[in-house]
Amino acid sequence: MRSEDVAAKKFGTTRWREGYEPQDVDELMERVRETLAGFERRRSINPITAAEVASALFTPTKFREGYDQNDVDDFLDEIVAALREHEAR
């Protein structure tokens, strides 16, 4: 996974089912993108860890637009795997 994969990711949205607050998710995605960009440049400063991503919590939404939880959770699993690979190097 590369930083541009994170930057380009678009999550599905939900209004009637519980979702995740978009701002919370977007803030985490920006930290992940910055971390991956740092690894790509071999100069990651203050990287977010796989453990931090795995334990991230988001404000729930309901009856207003939020990101689809399954979309976000599936992508977070991919991010955790990618970060673990970088951390093992």
Regions picked out by a protein language model, each given a short descriptive name:
Residues M1-R89:
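Acidic, negatively charged sequence signal
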